[in-house]
């Protein structure tokens, strides 16, 4: 996907009535190359392989829109958190389910992502209880930007994608990279330094030149 120049936006949604209920523990198997290692080594290799999904989403040049059409639990919840834009249907439900099966709720990036979306206090409550919360609450606490009727969710996701594609691919990719990097770097000046470099890179691109010509000529 990352090398597909025809793909401008990625939309994640579930098939059927749910977004993603999490990992299929019975069918995951072992990590390649670790089949003959001990249980601890195998388990750690599998864990690292699963957790690498979120950095892979982050590294895509295309924005990722999560269109949450039902329950998003455990690993599915992490997929929502790792997306760039989050929309939910009225029937969406969320929970950090790991803690409900005797594991830590800190998994697949959840402990880093959730506090940055909803604040540390709310994240601690949701992760320590593992409780299920609905789309209305998700919207109220800022986890999702929009809550829509079930039959309007995908139309809204595609409309948002088309809004994004009105901008240049490079500008979008640099904005996504810059936003994620700004969350990870420690201070304002470091963020500004990164922004300065990105703006100069973008300003000399063919896309930016064409966008300026279109604006001057009042083309869309």
Regions found by a protein language model. Give the residues of each.
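A short, well-ordered alpha-helical element
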Residues: 1-8
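Glycine- (often His-adjacent) and acidic-residue-rich active-site loop
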Residues: 6, 14-56, 102-103, 186
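CoA-thioester-processing core
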Residues: 53, 57-59, 67, 73-127, ...
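Well-ordered beta-strand positions
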Residues: 85, 125, 129-131, 137, ...
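C-terminal long alpha-helix characteristic of the crotonase
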Residues: 87-92, 144-193, 206
